[in-house]
Amino acid sequence: MATPTQSPTNVPEETDPFFYDYATVQTVGMTLATIMFVLGIIIIISKKVKCRKADSRSESPTCKSCKSELPSSAPGGGGV
């Protein structure tokens, strides 16, 4: 067994500036993750609902996300 070469010194304990209440950090993190997840689902669903309401006989849908442009249809763009 090894024996210590120096006697332990009594250093006054200072408060750790990087002390975290991990239960609170975990609770806040899970709450924010849940809120962002639900908002993402709502945004995805709302965009799909807008596209479904567009008139199917119309050539241009009402929402921009439903339009699909081909790279060859861009002005000045060449074909494939």
Curated annotation (Swiss-Prot):
It is a single-pass type I membrane protein. One of its GO terms (biological process) is positive regulation of sodium ion export across plasma membrane. Glycans are attached at residues 3, 5, 9. It is found in: Cell membrane. Changing residue 9 to A: Does not inhibit cell surface expression. Inhibits cell surface expression. PROSITE patterns: FXYD. Expressed specifically in brain. Expressed in both neurons and glia. Signal peptide: none annotated. Its main location: membrane. Associates with and regulates the activity of the sodium/potassium-transporting ATPase (NKA) which catalyzes the hydrolysis of ATP coupled with the exchange of Na(+) and K(+) ions across the plasma membrane. Reduces the apparent affinity for external K(+), an effect that depends on the presence of external Na(+) and voltage. Increases the apparent affinity for intracellular Na(+). The chain crosses the membrane at residues 23-45. This is FXYD domain-containing ion transport regulator 7. Pfam families: ATP1G1_PLM_MAT8 (PF02038). Keywords: Cell membrane, Glycoprotein, Ion transport, Membrane, Phosphoprotein, Potassium, Potassium transport, Sodium, Sodium transport, Sodium/potassium transport, Transmembrane, Transmembrane helix, Transport. Residues 1-22 are extracellular. CDD domains: FXYD7. Residues 56-80 are annotated as: Disordered. Residues 46-80 are cytoplasmic. Belongs to the FXYD family. One of its GO terms (cellular component) is plasma membrane.
